[in-house]
Regions:
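Conserved glycine-rich cofactor-binding loop
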Residues: 109-110
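Rossmann-fold cofactor-recognition segment
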Residues: 144-159
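Substrate-binding pocket helix/loop in short-chain dehydrogenase/reductase
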Residues: 189-190, 194-199
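Active-site helix of classical SDR
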Residues: 213, 249
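Residue(s) in the substrate-gating loop at a strand-loop-helix junction
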Residues: 233
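SDR active-site lid
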Residues: 266-343
């Protein structure tokens, strides 16, 4: 294995009890203090700076709007809160009741992963929850105990991934939904990223997904159905200075999953990329973990101070006070997505993700139009 030192995390206590009533703080999971050098979690999106990515203006311009969004009194722009799924999606409904699904979730102890686990269990599905070094005490209602398995899994190891897949099939004879929200990132300018850190990010974020797909796809293909739900990031929409290799892994994920979606459509398979905005963390976690715990922050050299390369570091610190996307709502949406007959290839959750994608597409179209006349023919005019 590469030089990728990951001290064992402190034991976690995972509570998958049903959701608290609306308006009450969700009592979901309490994680003991102590952190790894890297944490396998659902990757966070990062919005843009005023100089390089105009999206930040929208959030700094109206403190009152932010307050309404954070308190839930106003549906978040761009989210599906208060809106129905498009009819073409054929989401679960009274006329299209959901069938029980078997979930295989990688990154199940991250903020996003465990909320999805809970959403699936609350609605009658069964879950194999996998995470690296998952030394946990799982507290679940008695009626859920026969619908939840847990397993330690480092996605860089193809063998460990295969063992999780085999256990799932042995227990429930099938896999309906494969979900991956494992990702690591290192914050530093491209020039100053260590080779072993870059390799670690690609081994986890790209090769880990490759292992997951290759070991699960035969079972999905055999049944002519199934779906992949893969968490991307705003860093998969645009390159973020200070997160070059991490953005690279997310762009690789983009191409891989989109290609996969075309390949598996022939036998009824579906694949969806998820782009979350800045995720609200668990209330208990906020008290014991820094908002940047998702990334390893490297010291910045004098050469890169006060340059765009410092953007990612500033944004991670900024996120601590500007998280607007409800992770509980994400769990509910992902469950509905998994039970929809015609899911989209891309699903953006939160106004930051939506506006960042719009801005990226706008800039790309403008650039194409500005430069398209430079070369207009396919043959050499001599």
């Amino acid at each position: 294995m590469e030089d990728y030192d990951i001290p064992s995390p402190a034991p976690q206590i995972i509570s998958l009890t049903p959701s608290a009533p609306r308006g009450m703080p969700p009592a979901i999971i309490e994680q003991a203090s102590g952190s790894s050098r890297y944490t396998s979690v659902g990757s966070m999106g990062s919005s843009s700076s005023a100089e390089h990515f105009p999206l930040l203006h929208a959030y700094n311009s109206s403190a009152s709007s932010q307050a309404r969004i954070r308190t839930g009194t106003t549906p978040e722009p761009g989210s599906v809160a208060g809106a129905s799924w498009p009819a073409s999606c054929e989401a679960p409904s009274a006329s299209n009741p959901p069938k029980q699904h078997v979930w295989l979730i990688f990154g199940a102890t991250g903020t996003i992963g465990r909320h999805i686990c809970r959403a699936a269990l609350e609605r009658g599905d069964v879950v194999m929850a996998c995470s690296r070094n998952i030394k946990t005490t799982v507290a679940v209602p008695q009626e859920w105990s026969d619908r939840l398995l847990t397993s330690s899994c480092d996605v860089r190891s193809r063998q460990m991934v295969k063992e999780c897949v085999d256990r799932t099939v042995q227990r429930w004879n099938r896999i309906d939904v494969v979900l991956n929200c494992v990702a690591i990132g290192v914050i530093a300018p491209c020039e100053e990223q260590e080779e072993h850190d870059v390799r670690a990010q690609f081994e986890t974020n790209v090769m880990g997904l490759f292992h997951i797909v290759q070991t699960t796809l035969p079972y999905l293909r055999l049944r002519n159905r199934g779906r992949y739900i893969v968490f991307s990031s705003i860093a998969g929409i645009l390159g973020i200075p200070g997160l070059g290799p991490f953005s690279g892994t997310k762009w690789a994920t983009e191409g891989f999953v989109e290609s996969l979606a075309y390949e598996i459509e022939e036998f009824g398979g579906k694949a969806t990329l998820i782009y979350p905005g800045t995720i609200k963390q668990d209330e208990t976690q906020d008290k014991i973990s820094p908002p940047w715990r998702h990334f390893l922050i490297k010291p910045l050299s004098n050469e890169y101070r006060d340059t765009p390369a410092e953007h990612a570091r500033r944004m991670i610190l900024w996120l601590g006070a500007h998280r607007t996307t409800s992770v509980e709502k994400i769990g509910e949406i992902i469950w509905e997505l998994a039970h929809s007959n015609n899911p989209p290839l891309r699903l953006l959750l939160g106004s930051e993700a939506v506006e960042t994608m719009r801005e990226k597409l706008r800039q790309t179209i403008e650039e194409v139009e500005d430069w398209k006349f430079l070369f207009t023919g396919d043959a050499d005019d001599g």
